Amino acid sequence: MTFKILFYILFMALNTANQANSESQKALPPCRDSPNCVSSQAQDAKHYIEPYKINGSPEEAWNELKKVLNSQSRIVITHETADTLHAEATSLVFQFVDDINVILDKDTNTIHVRSASRTGHSDFGVNRKRIEALRLQLQKAHVID
């Protein structure tokens, strides 16, 4: 009987720890095989882009990120929570819509980013340039390294 109780307690403790861990690690949507996507959580070199390393307050970096996105004429934040954000970027000429996904990871002082075209195959590097331009703006604001 004691063995069953100990086993049950151990099982519940491990199960609770796994649930808490999986809930704290949010994931960006994966990139498709086409080259029109970049993600800081991608496992392959053609899609991978460095995440943003926060050098101060995560809240300050998060607020600055939202401020920068809101200042862009063709970017609209469509959904946000305390630690996730989705925005849409519309191209000037053809009105193509790209998705921007962002996750704030306070545990590692990191902002994970993804930018992907909804249609087509190639984006001529637009998504990578967008994420790097955003990085530069956040670096100028001294909220990321």
Describe the residue ranges of each PLM region.
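Ser/Thr-rich, low-complexity intrinsically disordered terminal regions
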Residues: 15-145
